Amino acid sequence: MIFAANLKCNHTRASFKIYAEILNKTMGAKCDDIIVFPPSVAFLENENNFIQGAQNFYPCVNGAFTGELGKEHLDEFGIKCVLIGHSERRALGDEEFIKAKFDFAKEHGYKIVFCIGENLDTKNSGKTLEFLKKQLEIIDLNYEKLIIAYEPIYSIGTGVSAQSTDIAKVLEFLASLTKVPLLYGGSVNENNIKEILSVNHCGGVLIGSAALKVENFIKLIKG
């Protein structure tokens, strides 16, 4: 199972250093199935027992792109895993860069956690699968370092996860399109994680607020 933590705009370098130290000690050995996405200002240079990923980046090595992170910056911290397509980035105008980001990350051999998800109106209109398929049309579903995270927008940050029957329907559909690992994200917590992980085709979870405290993240990993 893959356990990924998106820390979003939380943690400083000092606090994430403590987070990483505790997680490293608990794990004891390197595990590529544990991924943590800290904010970029908190990136750590030292080797960890988990994969450190980037929440955002610009599809360039470097250049005249004010305020952006290029490959050169990720390389400095040994980062080879990126999050692409999160709804909070799409809402900020990231939609037009998604294909360029994917293509760049693939070209450079990055592990990619690619997020897809529908809003409540799309769900209620019965067009979820059609919508998700369209979101996936711009990427290579056979890329060997791809992970797809299904995060229904109506569940992100609301404390209310999607119904397991809805999750199962979506993951079964996605499994018919690709053989890459499939994650669920959206208000994952200690009360629902076991049920979510028991859904057929679920290969793990992308966790938000429930992973902000390292002790909670460890508890979710251990089950």
UniProtKB/Swiss-Prot annotation:
Its EC number is 5.3.1.1. It comes from the Bacteria. Belongs to the triosephosphate isomerase family. CDD domains: TIM. Keywords: Cytoplasm, Gluconeogenesis, Glycolysis, Isomerase. The keyword Transmembrane does not apply. One of its GO terms (molecular function) is triose-phosphate isomerase activity. Involved in the gluconeogenesis. Catalyzes stereospecifically the conversion of dihydroxyacetone phosphate (DHAP) to D-glyceraldehyde-3-phosphate (G3P). HAMAP family: TIM_B. Pathway: Carbohydrate biosynthesis; gluconeogenesis; Carbohydrate degradation; glycolysis; D-glyceraldehyde 3-phosphate from glycerone phosphate: step 1/1. It is found in: Cytoplasm. NCBIfam families: PRK00042.3-2. GO terms for cellular component: cytosol. The keyword Membrane does not apply. Substrate binds at N6, L7, K8, G157, S187. It catalyses: D-glyceraldehyde 3-phosphate = dihydroxyacetone phosphate. It is an enzyme of class 5 (isomerase). Its main location: cytoplasm. Pfam families: TIM. GO terms for biological process: gluconeogenesis; glyceraldehyde-3-phosphate biosynthetic process; glycerol catabolic process; glycolytic process. This is Triosephosphate isomerase. Homodimer. The active site is at H86 (electrophile), E151 (proton acceptor).
